[in-house]
Amino acid sequence: MLHRKELRQYFELYCKPSAVDKKGQKLGPEYESLIVIPDCNDISGQTYVPLGMEGDDGVPGVLQRFQEFGQMVGEVWEGKYEGENLVGLENQEGASITIEPGGQIELSDQPRDHLSQVESSTRSFVRNLKESIRPIEGRLMFLGAQPLFDLDSISLSPKRRYHIMFQHMPEVGSLGQWMMKATAGTQLSLDYSSLEDLERKFRVICRLSPFLTAIFSNSPIHLGKPSGYKSFRNHIWQNTDDSRCGIPDSFISNNFQIEDYIDWALRASPYHLNREGEIHELMNHSFMDLMNGSHSQINVEFKDWENHLSMLFPEIRIKNIIEIRSMDTLTPEDVLAVPALLQALIYDETVFGRLESMLMDLPETEFPWYQQVAARDGLEGEVNRVKFRKFAVKLMEMALESMNLSEGCRLSVFFDRYTRHGISPADRVLERFYTADENPWKWFQIELEAEEEKQNSFINYPCKHSE
């Protein structure tokens, strides 16, 4: 029988005392890409379809070629299989390539010491992925949500757990199936040195979350037209499942403690648990119910708690790390601004103290509005006295002041390109859409060409200050 004290011990187990010092502070980036391939039914070659789940021109073929190209450039990627199906790749250093439910391909990088290492691994991922889709004339697309295709046009992974989730989604939210099939995000994981450090960082980062959504919003197009949201991806997440997503009020409270996170997690239900090869669907049982013996065949164990935590999707998630999940995916040359900004804001104690003062001064009652406004308006958002553009510029300037040229290169480029002017990547996407006379396929071709240029620039021209 699992006891409550063991739930708290999980977080204690993963405290990293070395994280109090800069040399021990790691960065754990995750980066998702959408992929499209030419529509074989269109002889004009002007339209595309999402990457499928089968065959040489689908996910298995892309993974196989990724592995083969990696070997050509001295990278060893081992296949991960379910039965005979190749479902992912991993290397000995701890990085992995995984497939999300709608065929999104994700780099889950190993913990990194320096931003230059994050840039190098991201460059390798983008280069290898481009080579892997070249034989099928595929194109990478770094937008936070599929901009043209409806749900039926996007294949669902054959993994059974995804099918269980997919069938459950309409019961708990209006857009959960879109979340699974059509979204792509950027995530960053940070360490905590103690439970006190975890609690302090968590409450501050939860308050920071809406501003991260606004700064890095990059998904304004849905079903071929402007959605009314700068981050339609974040809007999707807000309408997925209130029991396991979002930012509960207790998370932003001045008095937040790890017990609040445990209580919240206990109220959520596991999608399923595996026992001796049999999958038990458990959506009608909260984790607390299961601990109290509500299911005759399930006696929950410590590993079930760990698995349950990974199937919760708040904007900021606590596991063995603090996982920041509020950002849309971005083009490769823009995405390095995410770890650069967060490393400076969270790991630099002087900057973090200033950030804490700024954020904890804001009224708790306004934060649900912040999240809604961030998704809709990006940096044009305002809630009472808080102007998102002004707040974002202050955040960026605080971070850049603390960084040397090497650390700040990618962030300063992003700042000068977007935030300084009160815009996000979504605004540039919308500009291109209107330039294309609001014709979705004309815009899509322009968007793909713009992304291709940025991808090639990123691969061939490292940030001039990178070490």
For each predicted feature, which ranges?
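Terminal catalytic/cofactor-binding subdomain
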Residues: M1-S174, A182, D334, V338-Y347, ...
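Conserved phosphate-binding loops in nucleotide/dinucleotide-binding enzymes
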Residues: Q117, S193, D197, S326-V335, ...
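A very general structural signal that marks isolated residues within well-ordered alpha-helical segments
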Residues: D39, S193-L195, F211, L330, ...
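Structured core elements
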Residues: L34, Q187-S189, E323-R325
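Long, well-ordered mid-to-C-terminal structural blocks that present hydrophobic/aromatic surfaces
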Residues: M283-E366
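Loop-rich catalytic cores of soluble enzymes, especially ATP-dependent carboxylate-amine ligases
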Residues: R112, R134-M141, A145-R317
